[in-house]
Amino acid sequence: MISVYPAFYKDFRCKADRCVHSCCMQNWDIDIDEATAMKYLVMTGEPGETIRTSMAGTKGNRRFIMKDGRCPLLQEDGLCRIIAETGEENLCDICAMHPRFFVENGNFELAGVGLACEESVALLLSNSTPLLFMEDSASSLFDFPTLLSAMGCSLPEEALS
C-alpha cells in the first residue's frame, strides 16, 4: 500500500485551548475504541473514575456522554482532562486522530485533514503555491494531476486549472 498525503500533513498540530471552534464543543458523538475503553475501565484513581462516569454504552459501542454539547472531559481552560492528568497516550483513537482521515483507493492510502478544523484550513491556505503531495517512501513532492495519473485516474485539463 502506498501512503500519500498533502505536503503540510505532518505539520498539523491541534490548537487545543486556542481553537475557537473546538471539536470537543460540537455536540459530536465521540466513540471510544474498545482497546482504549478497556484501559479506562481499569484505570485507577480519580482520573479513571471521572472518565468512567463520563462514558456510556456497552462493549464495542462506548462513547462519551456530551454535556451541553461539550465533551465532559474538556476543562474550562480548553484543554483535555485525559491529556492533562494521564497523558496523550490515553486518548481514544478518534480524539488522537481527528481531524486526520484515511481513504483507501486501490494500492493507495490517501491521508488528509478534515476542513471542519480551523487549523487544517489555516495550513491549507498558508501556502500560495498549488497543493503538493508526498509519498511515505519518497522524499519528492508531486502535484494533483500527477497523483491522479499514478492512481490511474484522469480529469479534463480544464478541470485541473
Model-predicted segments: where are they?
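Metal-dependent nuclease catalytic cores that hydrolyze phosphodiester bonds in DNA/RNA
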Residues: 53
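Short loop/turn segments that flank or connect secondary-structure elements
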Residues: 1-22, 26-44, 56-68, 75-161
